[in-house]
Amino acid sequence: LLDYARRIGAELRFIEYMDVGGATQWSRERVMSRQDMLTVLGLAYGPVTAVIEDTSAPADRFKLPDGTIFGIISSTTAPFCHSCDRSRLTADGMWYRCLYATRGTDLRTPIRAGMSQDDLLRLIAGEWSTRADRGAEERLGISDRSPLVPASSLKQNPHLEMHTRGG
């Protein structure tokens, strides 16, 4: 993948296998960690150096000796919750302030009921300002991690599937 990305001028992102949504076969043993990725890439391409930057992006960026830049999203072994500024809005108007959230805020109903733009802005700002979501960090502390959401719950609430919220 990295060779292909380099050929087409794309900056590739690798992501650790996450225990979210329908990852019903997730286990820590199946996770290729950021460190594992860096080791494998270093052996294949030479020394890998970190690209130091102040950003809220979920990927940490790295450079190969030939100048190729790539990123790793290490949300399983080194979560980025402290700097996360992401949220997700589903196609049917549910707003989630964390990828790991099991509850969201219904924005469709108030919008369809005629909520003013100012009131909607206040609602969103109020919810965001009280945000305490740290889903990946909280999961990091669990020694016996199973999938975040059991398959039976996914059938009852499709919003819990990552593909419905862009995860």
What are these regions (language model features)?
Residues 1-69, 109:
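Radical SAM enzyme [4Fe-4S]-AdoMet core and its adjacent flexible, acidic
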Residues 19-21, 77, 102:
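Residue-level detector of flexible, active-site-proximal loop/helix-junction positions
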